[in-house]
């Protein structure tokens, strides 16, 4: 095992060394020469011409390009890329996942790969987890790009389609993962070329995904879905929410304990499954006056009752969701603690939760378009990612995305001290210990960040700290608006911050606080001037550098006063002093209140301390009532505590327990990886179908008129062939052909064939019969063109193709949803669910294509152009 680990580390070291020799050293050697370049934009555009017109490969220009980008950073925003950041930039260009510690400047690193790949002129995307980070990244780095002659844009949900088109037409576009995914789906529902927002020629060329583990692993199981309301009664959800209160939760059968399950239903927390017992089924049938709960007409009711029980037993307010001020049930992301407005649980679960909470039930939705992040990002010609924690998930990145992880060396050594876990018997015993440690450390003035796994825990700890008289700030899904402001100051002396999981991720915690953030925020609030205006940025940088020109630069900002400038200078001095004070105290201290299912999430929390060589420390507090320990840890450890007579206030620090935690985490990670991999296998079936439909649709939307005509004629020809295969197959004699059915089907689609002599086809060979019928249909098509004019005919064909494809695809998605929900039952019949799913999905798709071609034929020949 150690040999394997050593090999992994050796490979990483070798790859880093290769980049140092081929990129970093040559770029450094070019630095002085590059500093003498007067016009960086002109020099950079010359490189672009060499790529686009001169045929030079992008890779061959990485050294001069990186040298120019580094110099642009130094001149424009006062930030020169470190050597380690050059390594990160090269890794991102290579399409790898760059693991970079918190505080190593991922935002600046991305500029290297984005600007470099922008030389191809095909569009580059920087994908972030929220609008705030996208806007800040674009505004902070915008000047660097513009110094190189590049354009930069921000695509968010507030923009009109025309504004979004302009944003995506830029060389570099900052956008959130969800907005980008939805824009892709909306583009594939567009009814005109003008409605497309992504580039028509290269919509998905190159992307860097920030916090890549959050998007491609944590959110991999949550598909992006565009829905339309489907007509379905919702009152039953209220009925079943009341009905299940009369049911009794029982225990499952267990060898040696009980042979039959007890109660009306049992639950399985690990898989979030609910199982009705025979007793429960009988009771429900009696309460609802049903003969058979599982008869075809009652299947919906059985499903809704199961979801009502899941909503009651397995989904909890303040942990899995919140109810906002408008009375809407809003999902809380289990990994980040952020609320996810607009996202809804599927299969009626969201409606069941709404009924449980007594709020208005929204109609169930019908899927119009859907894609998972797993398959979406694989559509890019090239994509890369960056995060502080990726190595633990390298196998998944490699297996699913074909991307390996490169651990980038830190610019300065990490000196953070990570203490062993303290394990308590109960949750309250653990909380008491956390409060005690916070009080003790708070008394010294050290800043403390407390990480929690849920909103419920954060509010419980907040209450305990209030009782203990400890002032603190709370950061969770309920307070996202203040997120950046709270995190920016979480490193000041005496500050205590409670953060749900990784709320605030993406914003650095700077020791002593972030004076630049406060000054910028004050200018925006008091003067109404953007902190990213060039004159404001120049003033803030001058304050930070203690530049004598700060006063002169400040007076160029409209509305600013000398008194404001003096206050800004004093704030900077106080921040510098506090930074040193916090360093002397030991830096930021991290308190983890629970081990997460994933080691990666724990590492993210730890990584908030010790940035850029700062001191810091961390410790996790664990109890045997925590979800991870309760569901997955070994009962022997609890027995050991009992035998030792340990009470709630006594912790243990035992390697056996730490080992049990790590094994539990590894088991959960393996299980979750397995689930994501299975999801991908199923989604790959849908993905191939989606790619085929979207490619066909795009050809129709963007193709020239002659291509539309060719596509239409091809579909009509395929329809004719399918009718001949059905009613006049080659393998049977002419006498057995069902000419009446053939005539009926063809005349229904092509009225002009009313006078065609179908009976005469019997005297022909199958090939001749096909030629005669196709020829008659072609004549009808030409007559239709003449009737409408070629231009109107092409407009009709384009309209019909888009409408028919969209309608059939929507219905197909619904059918696939139903198939996916029921396919698990095949496992009970000793059949492989995936094989069955793939087989049936393929048949359904082929049937859809046949039906689609039939409808296109009917509409082309029957629709009046005025109706189009």
Curated annotation (Swiss-Prot):
Swiss-Prot/TrEMBL GO biological process terms: intracellular protein transmembrane transport; protein import; protein targeting; protein transport by the Sec complex
Gene3D superfamilies with a match to the protein in the record: Helical scaffold and wing domains of SecA (1.10.3060.10), P-loop containing nucleotide triphosphate hydrolases (3.40.50.300), SecA, preprotein cross-linking domain (3.90.1440.10)
Keywords: ATP-binding, Cell membrane, Cytoplasm, Membrane, Nucleotide-binding, Protein transport, Translocase, Translocation, Transport
GO molecular function, one term: ATP binding
Known catalytic reactions: ATP + H2O + cellular proteinSide 1 = ADP + phosphate + cellular proteinSide 2
EC number: 7.4.2.8
Keyword Protein transport: yes
Record GO cellular component, one term: cell envelope Sec protein transport complex
Primary location group: membrane
Domain of life, per lineage: Bacteria
Entry's family note: Belongs to the SecA family.
Complexes and interactors: Monomer and homodimer. Part of the essential Sec protein translocation apparatus which comprises SecA, SecYEG and auxiliary proteins SecDF. Other proteins may also be involved.
Functional note: Part of the Sec protein translocase complex. Interacts with the SecYEG preprotein conducting channel. Has a central role in coupling the hydrolysis of ATP to the transfer of proteins into and across the cell membrane, serving as an ATP-driven molecular motor driving the stepwise translocation of polypeptide chains across the membrane.
Protein name: Protein translocase subunit SecA
Provenance organism: Deinococcus radiodurans (strain ATCC 13939 / DSM 20539 / JCM 16871 / CCUG 27074 / LMG 4051 / NBRC 15346 / NCIMB 9279 / VKM B-1422 / R1)
């Amino acid at each position: 095992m150690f040999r394997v680990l050593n090999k992994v580390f050796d490979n990483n070291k070798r790859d880093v060394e290769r980049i140092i020799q081929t990129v970093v050293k040559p770029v450094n050697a070019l630095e002085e020469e590059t500093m003498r370049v007067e016009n960086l934009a002109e020099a950079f555009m010359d490189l672009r011409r060499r790529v686009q017109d001169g045929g030079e490969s992008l890779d061959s220009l990485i050294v001069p390009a990186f040298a120019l980008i580094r110099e642009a950073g130094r001149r424009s925003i006062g930030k020169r890329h470190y050597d380690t950041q050059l390594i990160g930039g090269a890794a991102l260009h290579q399409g790898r996942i760059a693991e970079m510690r918190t505080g190593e400047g991922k935002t600046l690193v991305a500029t290297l790969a984005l600007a470099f790949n922008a030389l191809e002129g095909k569009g580059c995307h920087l994908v972030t987890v929220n609008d705030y980070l996208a806007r800040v990244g674009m505004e902070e780095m915008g000047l660097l790009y513009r110094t190189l002659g590049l354009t930069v844009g921000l695509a968010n949900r507030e923009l009109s389609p025309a504004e979004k088109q302009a944003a995506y037409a830029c060389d570099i576009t900052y956008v959130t993962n969800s907005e980008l995914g939805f824009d892709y789906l909306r583009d594939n529902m567009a009814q005109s070329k003008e409605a497309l927002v992504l580039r028509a020629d290269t919509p998905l060329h190159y992307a860097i995904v920030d916090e890549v583990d959050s998007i491609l692993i944590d959110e991999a199981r949550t598909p992006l879905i565009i829905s339309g309301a489907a007509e379905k009664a919702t009152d039953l959800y209220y009925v079943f929410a009341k009905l299940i209160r009369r049911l009794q939760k029982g225990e499952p059968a267990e060898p040696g304990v009980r042979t039959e399950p007890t109660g009306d239903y049992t639950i399985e927390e690990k898989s979030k499954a609910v199982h009705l017992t025979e007793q429960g089924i009988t009771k429900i049938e009696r309460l609802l006056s049903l003969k058979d709960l599982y008869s075809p007409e009652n299947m919906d009711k059985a499903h809704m009752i199961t979801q009502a029980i899941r909503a009651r037993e397995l989904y909890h307010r303040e942990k899995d969701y919140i109810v906002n001020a408008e009375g809407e049930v809003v999902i809380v992301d289990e990994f980040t603690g952020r609320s996810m407005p607009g996202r809804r649980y599927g299969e009626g679960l969201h409606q069941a939760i709404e009924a449980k909470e007594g709020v208005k039930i929204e109609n169930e939705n019908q899927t119009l378009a859907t894609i998972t992040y797993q398959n979406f990002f694989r559509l890019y010609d090239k994509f890369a990612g960056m995060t502080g924690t990726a190595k633990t998930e390298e196998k998944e990145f490699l297996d699913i995305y074909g991307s390996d992880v490169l651990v980038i060396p830190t610019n300065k050594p990490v000196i953070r001290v990570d203490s062993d876990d303290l394990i308590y018997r109960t949750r309250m015993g653990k909380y008491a210990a956390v409060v005690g440690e916070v009080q003790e450390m708070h008394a010294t003035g050290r800043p403390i960040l407390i990480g929690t796994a849920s909103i419920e825990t954060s509010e419980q700890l907040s209450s305990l700290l209030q009782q203990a008289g400890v002032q603190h700030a709370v950061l969770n899904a309920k307070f996202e608006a203040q997120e950046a402001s709270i995190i920016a100051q979480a490193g000041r002396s005496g500050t205590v911050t409670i953060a749900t999981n990784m709320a605030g991720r993406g914003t650095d915690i700077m020791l002593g606080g972030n004076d630049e953030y406060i000054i910028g925020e004050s200018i925006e609030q008091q003067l109404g001037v953007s902190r990213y205006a060039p004159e404001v940025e120049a003033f803030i940088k001058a304050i930070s550098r203690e530049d004598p020109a700060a006063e002169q630069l400040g007076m160029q900002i409209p509305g600013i006063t000398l008194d404001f400038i003096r206050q800004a200078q004093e704030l900077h001095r106080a921040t510098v002093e506090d930074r040193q004070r916090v360093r002397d105290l030991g830096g930021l201290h991290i308190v983890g209140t629970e081990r997460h299912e994933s080691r990666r999430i724990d590492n993210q929390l730890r990584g908030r301390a010790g940035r850029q060589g700062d001191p810091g420390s961390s410790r996790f507090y664990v109890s045997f009532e925590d979800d991870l320990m309760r569901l997955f840890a070994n009962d022997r450890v609890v027995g050991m505590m009992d035998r030792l007579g340990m009470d709630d206030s006594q912790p243990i620090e035992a390697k056996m327990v730490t080992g049990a935690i790590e094994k539990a985490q590894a088991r959960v990670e393996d299980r979750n990886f397995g689930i994501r991999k299975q999801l991908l296998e199923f989604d790959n079936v849908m993905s191939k179908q989606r790619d085929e439909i979207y490619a066909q649709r795009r050809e129709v939307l963007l193709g020239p008129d002659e291509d539309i005509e060719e596509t239409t004629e091809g579909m009509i020809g395929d329809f004719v062939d399918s009718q001949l295969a059905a009613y006049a197959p080659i393998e049977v004699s002419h006498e057995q052909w069902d000419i009446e059915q053939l005539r009926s089907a063809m005349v229904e689609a092509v009225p002009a064939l009313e006078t065609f002599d179908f009976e005469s086809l019997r005297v022909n060979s199958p090939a001749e019969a096909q030629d005669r019928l196709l020829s008659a249909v072609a004549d009808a098509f030409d007559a239709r063109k003449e009737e409408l004019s070629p231009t109107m005919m092409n407009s009709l064909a384009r309209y019909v193709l888009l409408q028919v494809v969209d309608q059939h695809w929507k219905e197909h998605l619904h059918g696939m949803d139903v198939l996916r929900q029921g396919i698990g039952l095949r496992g009970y019949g000793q059949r492989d669910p995936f094989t069955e799913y793939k087989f049936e999905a393929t048949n359904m798709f082929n049937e859809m294509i046949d039906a689609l071609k039939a409808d296109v034929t009917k509409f082309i020949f029957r629709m009046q152009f005025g109706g189009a």
